[in-house]
Amino acid sequence: MGKHLVRCLPALLLAGALPLATQAATPAAASKQVQTAAAHAGMALGAADLKMAHAHLQHVVNCLVGPAGTGFDASAANPCKGMGQGAIVDAKGDAATEARLQQALQEAESGLKTTTLDDAHADAQKALSTLQTK
């Protein structure tokens, strides 16, 4: 029985350490994804046409919800690929940040429904301001 414990001990230690490592990386992962989402909200704000504004607003959504989230569009680029599970997912446990990111998500999604460049720019500005708020 002692031999089995010695063989399993490294795996048990690793299994116990993984959740701690994940928790430690979560705020940093969320922060990096928020910064990337804000950059794309800024790109949407500066877009010269509606198609480009919508493309960057979709990037904002993709960064916020992550690949498993509602609203994620796999056919659009995911500039946050490899950074985490989505800023909203990675911010779990921080109620104020979650609420702010949900608001930014609603603003970006609203921008995706616009039919004029001015309206898309207005929603991109709202999302950018929300994402830059601390």
Model-derived segments and their meaning:
Residues 25-134:
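Mature extracytoplasmic or organellar-lumen-exposed domains after removal of signal/transit peptides
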